[in-house]
Structures are given as structure tokens and as C-alpha cells.
UniProtKB/Swiss-Prot annotation:
Matches recorded under HAMAP family: Cytb6_f_PetG
Protein name: Cytochrome b6-f complex subunit 5
GO MF, one annotated term: electron transporter, transferring electrons within cytochrome b6/f complex of photosystem II activity
Membrane topology listed for this record: Single-pass membrane protein
NCBIfam families in the cross-refs: PRK00665.1 (NF001907)
GO biological process entries: cytochrome complex assembly; photosynthesis
Subcellular location as annotated: Plastid, Chloroplast thylakoid membrane
């Protein structure tokens, strides 16, 4: 079914996206305000 496939893709991508945002924010926090990105 298409719904099952889409739900599986969403459930797989959401944790990866949240982890990526968390890691990016953590790295920027560690660097401080030295680099203005």
C-alpha cells in the first residue's frame, strides 16, 4: 500500500531530521559566537 510506504518513509525521516537539527544547534552552541553563520 502507498499509505504504508509513505508512513514508513515519514517515520524514518522524522527522527533523522530532528537528530540533524539537534546536532547542528549543538555544534553552533559549542562554537559560541565566534563564527557568525
Amino acid at each position: 500500500m502507498v499509505e504504508t510506504l509513505l508512513s514508513g518513509i515519514v517515520l524514518g525521516l522524522v527522527p533523522i531530521t530532528l537528530a540533524g537539527l539537534f546536532v547542528t544547534a549543538y555544534l553552533q552552541y559549542r562554537r559560541g559566537d565566534r563564527l557568525d553563520i
